Amino acid sequence: YVNLGQYQEAAADFEMGLRIDPKNWDCWYHLGLSYHLMGSYERALKAYETCYALSPTDEYRICTTDWYCMTLMKMGRIDDMRKAASRIHADMEPGMSEGYFDRVLVYNGTRNIDEVLAEAAAKDDHMYATGAYGLAVYEEYVLGNREKAKEILTRIAGRDETWGGFAEHA
């Protein structure tokens, strides 16, 4: 349902899955995503907090922290976002969460936003969207630069080879 844009139905499915297996990391992560995409940010935060606690490796902690931070940004809770981002550090192993990793390192001040955007631009469309979307959120909600955020989002939309990722939905 998430990929169809039916976020309420997706949340209902993930909630049902959690009744069956309350420690299912994937259900918690995608429940948080569903709530985030519906604009139910408080509920998204709670799902991501549980998801983070269940995260078995850096790879899982990184992607969970990224969506948690974006949720906090959209809520205007910038100090809380910086605190959450600080738990991710450059010597972690990102695995498949590389795009999330680089942007969380921007959120916590370890990496430069322009460098990360340039690196993301060299990747395929899906990985560009993954790397750039959170930086657009950061530009708008943290730096107050709505025009630059809009430029990033326009570039994401203009790279139309793949459209299956969560950044494209957000």
What role is predicted for each listed range?
Residues 20, 54-57, 159:
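Structural marker of alpha-solenoid helical repeat scaffolds
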